[in-house]
Every structure is written in C-alpha cells, then in structure tokens.
C-alpha cells in the first residue's frame, strides 16, 4: 500500500484490507494463483497504488469450476429453498453491517462519490439479495393436462420441475462493481446454482470483501468462487469452459460478441447486458427544472460510465435553448473531486486510458462541427478527472451521437412539431436499445412515445428507473435476456417435464 493510501481518511478495517496481497477465493479458501502474476490496484482519484491482487490463470478457473461442480452436486443440492433464503438474508445483513468498509473500498477502487457508493450498497446490493431471497421458496413447476390424443390418453400425470442449470460463470464490469456482483450473485443463489465469478481486474476490492461475508454467512464452500484476472485469460476460460452451463456478462458489446463465440463449444446459456446510447426525449410542456436535473443525472451518473446513460438529449425547439442553458449552467458548477470528499458530485474516470478514449471523442465532436457548449477539458491535476461536457448539433451524423462514449459527454439535438412516429424514428436511430426516457405532462403522449422507443426499459418523467423487481435488459446490440425481477431468474433455470402413465391406453 502506498504512502498516499496510508494517509487517506478511511477506517482502520479498510486500511488493513488494502494492505494485503489478495488471493483467489476457491472452495471456501484463499489460495495462491498458479500464474504467479500480480496486479497493483490504482485509486483513480490519486493515481496511487492502494493494494495488490493475484491474477487467475486458466488452471485456476478449472479449479474453481471443479469446486463449484462438487458443491452443486453435493452439500448445496441438499439445502432446501427455505435454508437458501436464510443464508441469503444473512449475507444481505452482513453487507449492511460492513457498509463503511465496502463503501470506502468501492470509492477507492472505482472513483465514484461516497454518497453513490453507500446508495449502491445499502439501497441496492443488499436489498437486491433480499429480493431474490424471497424467490427461493416460490420457484416451482406446473401440472399439465395432456390432450386426449396424447400418448397417455388422459390416464397420466404430467408435471414440470424448474431446476438450476448448474455452474454459472459471471463476468463483472468495473463501472459499478458491487452492484453488478449482487445482480448476478442473487438470482444464482436463489435458483440453487453455484458460481465462478471474475470481477474486473481493475476494480476487484469489494468483490474480495464480499467473499469474506459469503464465508461468514455460512454459504457452503465451493458455492461461490472468485477468480480475479484479465478478461483475455480468466474471462475467456469462463466463457469457453465445457462445465460451465451459463455465462452472465455485463460490459461492452464487442466483448459480448466474443463471449457468444466462446460459448458455442457446449452451447451454454448466455445473458448479456451490453452497451447503450439512450435517448432522452423532452416535449415542450415538460417541467424544465425536472428535465434539467433529470438530464444531468441521466448523462453524468457514475461520470457517464454507465450503460443506461441518457447521452442523446432530444428537446423540442420551443424550449431547446432554455434547457441547454440550464443543463450547461448546472454541469459547469458541478464539484469535481475525489469520491472520499463528501462535497464531490463527480469523481474521476476509471483510468488514464479511459479518459484518453473519452477525450478523443470530445476532439472528434469538435472536428466534425458539433458545438461545444460547456466542458470538454481534462483537469490538470492528479487523478483521471474531466469536466462534464455538452455538445449540440442539428443532426445525428456525428460520431459523438452514434457511438457509446462511456464518459461524461452529452449530445443534444432539437426537434420540431413532427408526429410521434417521426420523433421516435430519430430516437431509435442507434444500434443500441437499452434505456430511454420521455418527459411530458401529457400522459397520453408519454405512454405513446414510450411504446415507440425501441429499448428494453423506458421511463416517463424520470430516467433509468431501476428496482430489483423491474426487468432490465437491452434490445438490438444492447444485449440478450433480462436481469432483475422474476424474469431475471429464467437464465439460471431449466425446465424438466415428467409424465407418469397410470394405465396403458387402449389401441
């Protein structure tokens, strides 16, 4: 741990956790990686190394899968649904009890403001686990009446069982580490699956801490295994492993496509939550103050490093200038700083490479003739900081309007008195279809426009309304399947139909 990390205003427990060289968590034990490789973990707000992890090899992934298989066929299979509920509720309680350390680790690892870290833990991660704990006892099959012409001729019983698919591989992104971990861990445990989890190698700290809590909660050894490592090594091994029956991935569309190719070997189930370029459509009767703050949150939440980000702002021409002036005014006054500073509203980007990538889009916007309204600069100080940025242009023919930037860059465009279908066609002019929002006081217009936007999730007078019970996922190049809610259980389950013949049919 660096001298900088030692002087941070963090708890003793967090400081002690950072001081370790972190191993892999396999079969309930902390074990050394066979690769012998380590990686320093960097605080994006200071550029200082704050901790070090060991990196998993393909052999390590194999060991984790073997442990997960043994647990799936052994002790975990003997634990009933009521017991699974109790174990999950215990884990959720432990997460809440450790919120200070978890929040500090999330801030140091990822850079997000402390307020958001605390929210994603207590207001999301633990509640998400509790929500799915409630599903453990409600997963069931059906009895099915067969047709008179069926082979059993009515003198039979046919029923279905919902069974866990087996060992699940989960690949976690760096933009919301603990939230994404909970999102994949909870439905897997609820359905009775076991897991091999690969956190993003640059943000593994909260996942490592949660493994301690998994052990403390009494979840049997081998049910949850953690293999931090590079995507091209550990992630690729998970995606192609013949004994992993399902992969859940959140990340870029390009990597998602590679995972699909790797999964072909054993035709494993794949669920993907990928990129986005979500539209925010504002009609002239909308509450401008609400729109202003809604657009700010939609575009700049997590420094714009989130797949749901509302990065394409469509505003009716009658209020366009006012909305742009308001958004620029708020964005320009946002406090940019380290997440541990309680006054910070916008933290750093995750890395120097990510900031360079985002800044290249800013330059592309300028080069292609978009008008820079505010921001557009990186900060000349330690940390990977940049200003929230707003561009406008009359058309979506510029790169910043088409491609996912994954940074605090908002593109705004006016529209006129067109019919809703024409406006929706502009909003849908994207390869992505993850989220979106409509802002209006006319509920009929709001509902109609929401129905026309081709996204897996659309909100009216808010953006990215998420809740454990609301299904979430993308259309088009934004992914496959749904997470959250009852639908989030489906990828972890398979259906078995059984028919019992009572008497031979007369022929």
Predicted features, each with a name:
Residues 47, 84, 106, 192, ...:
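Residue-level signal for inorganic ion chemistry
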Residues 1-53, 86, 90, 138-171, ...:
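Terminal low-complexity tails and localization/encapsulation signals of metabolic enzymes
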Residues 254-396, 418-421, 460, 505-507:
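ALDH superfamily catalytic-core signature
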Residues 48-51, 244, 281, 335, ...:
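Conserved C-terminal structural/oligomerization subdomain of aldehyde/semialdehyde dehydrogenase
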Residues 49-56, 73-77, 169-170, 280-283, ...:
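Short, well-ordered beta-strand elements within core beta-sheets of diverse protein domains
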Residues 140-290:
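Rossmann-like NAD(P) dinucleotide-binding subdomain of oxidoreductase/dehydrogenase enzymes
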């Amino acid at each position: 741990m660096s001298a900088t990390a030692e002087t941070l205003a963090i708890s003793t427990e967090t400081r002690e956790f950072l001081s370790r060289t972190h191993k892999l968590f396999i079969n309930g034990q902390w074990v050394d990686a066979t690769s012998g490789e380590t990686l320093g973990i960097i605080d994006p707000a200071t550029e200082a190394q704050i901790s070090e992890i060991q990196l998993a090899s393909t052999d390590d992934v194999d060991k984790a899968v073997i442990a997960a298989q043994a647990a799936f066929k052994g002790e975990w299979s003997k634990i009933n649904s009521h017991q699974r509920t109790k174990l999950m509720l215990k884990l959720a309680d432990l997460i809440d009890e450790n919120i200070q350390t978890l929040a500090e680790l999330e801030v140091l690892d990822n850079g997000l403001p402390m307020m958001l870290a605390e929210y994603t833990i207590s207001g999301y991660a633990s509640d998400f686990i509790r929500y799915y704990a409630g599903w453990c006892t409600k997963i069931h099959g059906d009895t099915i009446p067969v047709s008179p012409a069926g082979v059993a001729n009515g003198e039979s019983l046919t029923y279905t069982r919902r069974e866990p698919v087996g060992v699940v591989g989960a690949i976690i992104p760096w933009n919301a580490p603990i939230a994404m971990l909970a999102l994949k861990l909870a439905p897997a445990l609820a359905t009775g699956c076991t897991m091999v989890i690969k956190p993003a190698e640059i943000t593994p700290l909260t996942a490592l801490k949660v493994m301690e809590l998994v052990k403390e909660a009494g979840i049997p050894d081998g049910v949850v295994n953690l293999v931090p490592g590079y995507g091209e090594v550990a992630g690729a091994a998970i995606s192609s492993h013949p004994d992993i029956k399902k992969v859940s991935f959140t990340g870029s569309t390009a990597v998602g496509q590679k995972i699909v190719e790797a999964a072909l070997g054993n035709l494993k189930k794949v669920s993907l939550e990928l990129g986005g370029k979500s539209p925010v459509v504002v009609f002239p009767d909308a509450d401008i103050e609400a729109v202003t703050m809604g657009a700010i949150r939609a575009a700049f939440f997590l420094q714009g490093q989130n797949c749901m980000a509302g990065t394409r702002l469509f505003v009716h021409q009658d209020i366009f200038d006012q909305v742009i002036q308001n958004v620029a005014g708020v964005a320009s006054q946002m406090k940019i700083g380290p997440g541990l500073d309680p006054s910070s509203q916008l933290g750093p980007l995750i890395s120097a490479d990510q900031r360079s990538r985002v800044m290249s889009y800013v330059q592309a916007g300028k080069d292609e003739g978009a008008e820079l309204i505010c921001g557009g600069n990186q900060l000349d100080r330690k940390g990977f900081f940049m200003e929230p940025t707003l561009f406008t242009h009359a058309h979506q023919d510029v790169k910043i309007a088409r491609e996912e930037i994954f940074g605090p860059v908002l593109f705004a465009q006016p529209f006129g008195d067109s019919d809703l279908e024409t406006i929706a066609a502009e909003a849908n002019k994207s390869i992505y279809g993850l989220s979106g929002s409509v802002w209006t006081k006319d509920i009929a217009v709001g509902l109609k426009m929401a129905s026309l936007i081709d996204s897996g999730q659309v909100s009216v007078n808010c953006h990215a309304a998420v809740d454990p019970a609301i299904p979430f996922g993308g259309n088009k190049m934004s992914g496959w399947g749904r997470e959250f809610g009852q639908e989030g259980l489906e990828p972890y389950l398979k259906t078995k139909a059984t028919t019992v013949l009572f008497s031979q049919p007369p022929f």
